């Protein structure tokens, strides 16, 4: 652990950086960066790190979609710690197929008002990023003694965008070019703290996922005046009508699936949820002939112990029970992980949390352990990782952070680094 004088000096330095924290979070959160278009946000972080002496590098597959990696160098002999958050956000202004209010400013802007910083992009995930950027700046400016390096990692492509059908290439890649790419190309450390919203509750297990495309076949297609009636929905020549019955059956299966596959782990509880995220059938400007095929796209979360093929076969069994002609095809699989050897980071974080927040940490909620977070690529590659940050998640509807909580998070991050990076690896 760093000396008490170092800790006090860093905490005092952070108290003086409150306005800088607000400015960084608002500026970064105001940059439009939907998945596929993170370049401007990456440039901001690169320039910020360069200006503050962290020697950043652009590490990425594409010139306009890259990860930013900076370092606060230690003197040697101590454990290294990565901080990680993502640059991309959930919403583009043209995303009207998913959101009725896609142009609402809450998705595209950030602002400070009465001790709160508003904006989806702040909550997910540029607010936590601002916290560890400011924490690193305070460590540097206060001259804190660190033996191990602090690795600052701002990544692209964390949000669940995946190539499928004609949607291929640059704009549709996500996790393959984000944290995992950065780690594989040099952003390595002994431990990693993924800064995201967890209500100050650390979690070190995350779900995996399998995405399935399920296509129902019917036919023959007929001109509207020749539509046969009456006919049972499962016998309809219209694939959309048949799909309606399958969706109903899959929703019933999904409820049962999450109950059967819920698992308790040391790092949290995984409750694997299922969502039907998209449907394609017919041509909107040629509706006079109903479609002979209709597809849905399923997002199925997996606990770390579940084989995706088992889940695929369960979905196929639902289809078979209805007597439908259909194809069930996986187009994405990513495994979930529970951290191994996390105790040194967990213990350092616990000490820092108690000092700053004033109480022991609590067990995380299941949503924080049942989604994708970039703890997974770290844990996959053997770098023990947990996620921890202030406030509730944007996926659950939260739209702001308290500045006081963000400052607390920055202090916890700084104290954790001062402890862990002065331990022997």
From Swiss-Prot:
Q: How does activity depend on temperature?
A: Optimum temperature is degrees Celsius.
Q: Report which reactions are catalysed by this protein.
A: 5-nitroanthranilate + H2O + H(+) = 5-nitrosalicylate + NH4(+)
Recorded effect of pH on activity: Optimum pH is 7.2.
Sorted UniProt keywords? Hydrolase, Metal-binding
Q: What class of enzyme is it?
A: hydrolase
What EC designation does it have? Answer: 3.5.99.8
Picking any one GO molecular function of the record gives: metal ion binding
Q: Relate the protein's function as given in its record.
A: Catalyzes the deamination of 5-nitroanthranilate (5NAA) to 5-nitrosalicylate (5NSA), the first step in biodegradation of 5-nitroanthranilate.
Task: Name the family the entry cites.
Answer: Belongs to the peptidase M20A family.
Mind telling me what this protein is named? 5-nitroanthranilic acid aminohydrolase
Q: From the UniProt record, report the name of the gene that encodes this protein.
A: naaA
